[in-house]
């Protein structure tokens, strides 16, 4: 179950990143990857949800889009809270 949740979260992160890139008028993954200092194939895998991402890499990719980490993750807040392990009493 945790594996399925991780895969779903990676896909949602990738979809959000792709949407923000397109909204910013950057139609080419290659342009964003170059601006962020990451390889285009790594960005492609990230957008497709095929790989996880570190906070450092995500921040680098978001910088050319002028999006903060807080703004990026804001739509995921309720999802992350519901996925948090609950303490036993």
Predicted regions and their residues:
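Short amphipathic helical patch at the helix-1/turn junction of helix-turn-helix
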Residues: 11, 22-23, 52
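Recognition helix of helix-turn-helix/homeodomain-like DNA-binding domains
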Residues: 36-53
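Helix-turn-helix DNA-binding elements, focusing on the entry/boundary residues of the two helices
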Residues: 17, 28-29, 40, 55-58
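Conserved hydrophobic/aromatic packing and binding residues within compact polymer-binding modules
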Residues: 17, 32, 43-46, 72
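DNA major-groove recognition helix of helix-turn-helix/homeodomain DNA-binding modules
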Residues: 54-71
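Short basic helix-loop element that most often maps to the first helix and adjoining turn
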Residues: 15-34
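Basic, helix-initiating cap at the start of DNA-binding domains
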Residues: 3-16
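Short, charged recognition helix plus adjacent turn
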Residues: 2-3, 63, 73-89
């Amino acid at each position: 179950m945790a594996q399925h949740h991780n895969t779903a979260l990676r896909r949602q992160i990738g979809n959000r990143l792709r949407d923000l890139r397109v909204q910013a008028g950057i139609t080419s993954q290659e342009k964003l990857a170059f601006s962020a200092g990451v390889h285009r194939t790594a960005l492609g895998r990230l957008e497709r949800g095929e790989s996880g991402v570190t906070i450092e890499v995500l921040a680098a990719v978001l910088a050319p889009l002028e999006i903060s980490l807080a703004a990026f993750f804001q739509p995921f807040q309720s999802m992350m809270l519901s996925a948090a392990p609950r303490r036993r009493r």
